[in-house]
Curated annotation (Swiss-Prot):
Subcellular location: Cytoplasm
GO BP of this protein: regulation of DNA-templated transcription
InterPro entries per UniProt: Integrase-like_N (IPR017856), TACO1_YebC-like_2nd/3rd_dom (IPR048300), TACO1_YebC_N (IPR049083), Transcrip_reg_TACO1-like (IPR002876), Transcrip_reg_TACO1-like_dom3 (IPR026564), YebC-like (IPR029072)
Assigned GO CC terms: cytosol
UniProt family annotation: Belongs to the TACO1 family.
Keywords from the named record: Cytoplasm, DNA-binding, Transcription, Transcription regulation
Protein's name in the database: Probable transcriptional regulatory protein Rxyl_1318
Gene3D superfamilies on file: 1.10.10.200, 3.30.70.980
Gene Ontology terms, MF aspect: DNA binding
Location, primary (coarse class): cytoplasm
Source organism phylogeny: Bacteria, Bacillati, Actinomycetota, Rubrobacteria, Rubrobacterales
């Protein structure tokens, strides 16, 4: 996502995510366990599990943790619980559209928490469908710009079925249709191209440019949502220039 991905990169460089690693692993484990419960423990035959496992690996979760999460989903007396997937939609300051993907065992608690976070940070929780039309589901693979040349990446990605390849800051951004995502990821791996992350994402079709003040408010809202235990993913359609991002992160 324009702006958001850059902010995430800045946070990683500053080490801000280190303190949240335990909470992140707990969320990733929950997603793996539920995916294994719903579709079986073989990633080759369960695309949802394959994506959850890949996301965990991208976050450097130990393989033992990943396997234990799969076992919880497939074993007798599963700890997966009665979790359900819910998507909330709303607005951040500046008219920024926000989508929040939740995996929760308590729908009422999740709704209350998400509504409170939006309200506290100057946003507003909307109704189903209020902003979803502003996004489209895409596969997104981020490749470090110094890991591969443009021509080599373009050839491998497009041959595997990618839709587009563009430079976004210090990363190449490979975009695919959801149906081609797994094939493109596999194609890059077979070509020996190292990528930093690969996931299905809700990509904004248009973006809202933010000044420094509104960017700070919006990013505080995004961070608060991401820190909630039930929240798996947050998507927003803001765009923050390099100059404003540097001011916000300074």
């Amino acid at each position: 996502m324009s702006g958001h991905s850059k902010w995430s990169t800045i946070k990683r460089k500053k080490g801000a995510m280190d303190a949240k690693r335990g909470a992140l692993f707990a969320k990733l484990s929950r997603a793996i366990t539920v995916a294994a419960r719903e579709g079986g423990g073989d990633p080759e035959a369960n695309p949802a599990l394959a994506l959850a496992v890949q996301k965990a690996k991208d976050a450097n979760m130990p393989n033992d943790n990943i396997q234990r999460a799969i076992d919880r989903g497939t074993g007798a007396g599963s700890e997966a619980g009665d979790y359900e997937h819910i998507t909330y939609e709303g607005y951040a300051p500046g008219g920024v559209a926000v989508m929040v993907e939740v995996l929760t065992d308590n729908r009422n608690r999740a709704a209350s928490d998400i509504r409170y976070i939006f309200s506290k940070h100057g946003g507003k929780l909307g109704t189903s469908g209020s902003v979803a039309y502003l996004f489209e589901r895409k596969g997104v693979v981020l490749v470090p710009a110094d890991a591969v040349g443009e021509e080599e990446l373009m050839e491998a990605a497009l041959e595997a079925g990618a839709e587009d390849v563009e430079l976004d800051g210090d990363h190449w951004r490979v975009t695919t249709e959801p149906s081609e995502f797994m094939a493109v990821r596999q194609g890059l791996e077979e070509a020996g191209i190292r990528y930093e992350s690969a996931q299905l994402s809700m990509e904004p079709m248009n973006t809202v440019k933010l000044d420094a003040s509104t960017a700070r408010q919006t990013l505080r809202l995004i961070d608060a949502l991401e820190e909630n235990d039930d929240v798996q993913e947050v998507y927003a359609n803001f765009d923050i220039s390099e100059e404003v991002m540097a001011e916000v992160a300074g």
